[in-house]
Amino acid sequence: MAEPWSGQSLQALPATVLGALGALGSEFLREWEAQDMRVTLFKLLLFWLVLSLLSIQLAWGFYGSTVTGLYHRPGLGGQNGSTPDGSTHFPSWETAANEPLKTHRE
């Protein structure tokens, strides 16, 4: 029969995870101070990400209302500029309803 989990192993789990994260962080700091090429690449990619996010935020500030206006058009239609209620009336279809359906042979 399998042994149940002991309370000590569950209590040691957060300490183990924090220890591993601490070791990873200290290794990263050593490489950061040594100006390793990977760290330089990381800095460059982090700068690119921050610059891209700031550019998106700035563009949304200028053009956000225009983009929102494309999706929410005023008019007779429902939400998001759907087909107006009055346009579903097709008189040519009503006159054709009295005629029998045509088959592909006719």
From Swiss-Prot:
<feature type="compositionally biased region" description="Polar residues">
    <location>
        <begin position="81"/>
        <end position="90"/>
    </location>
</feature>
<feature type="topological domain" description="Cytoplasmic">
    <location>
        <begin position="30"/>
        <end position="43"/>
    </location>
</feature>
<dbReference type="Pfam" id="PF15128">
    <property type="entry name" value="T_cell_tran_alt"/>
</dbReference>
<feature type="transmembrane region" description="Helical">
    <location>
        <begin position="9"/>
        <end position="29"/>
    </location>
</feature>
<keyword id="KW-1133">Transmembrane helix</keyword>
<dbReference type="GO" id="GO:0072675">
    <property type="term" value="P:osteoclast fusion"/>
</dbReference>
<feature type="topological domain" description="Extracellular">
    <location>
        <begin position="65"/>
        <end position="106"/>
    </location>
</feature>
<protein>
    <recommendedName>
        <fullName>T-cell leukemia translocation-altered gene protein homolog</fullName>
    </recommendedName>
</protein>
<dbReference type="InterPro" id="IPR016560">
    <property type="entry name" value="TCTA"/>
</dbReference>
<feature type="modified residue" description="N-acetylalanine">
    <location>
        <position position="2"/>
    </location>
</feature>
<comment type="similarity">
    <text>Belongs to the TCTA family.</text>
</comment>
<comment type="function">
    <text>May be required for cellular fusion during osteoclastogenesis.</text>
</comment>
<feature type="region of interest" description="Disordered">
    <location>
        <begin position="74"/>
        <end position="106"/>
    </location>
</feature>
<feature type="transmembrane region" description="Helical">
    <location>
        <begin position="44"/>
        <end position="64"/>
    </location>
</feature>
<keyword id="KW-0812">Transmembrane</keyword>
<keyword id="KW-0472">Membrane</keyword>
<feature type="topological domain" description="Extracellular">
    <location>
        <begin position="2"/>
        <end position="8"/>
    </location>
</feature>
<keyword id="KW-0007">Acetylation</keyword>
<dbReference type="GO" id="GO:0016020">
    <property type="term" value="C:membrane"/>
</dbReference>
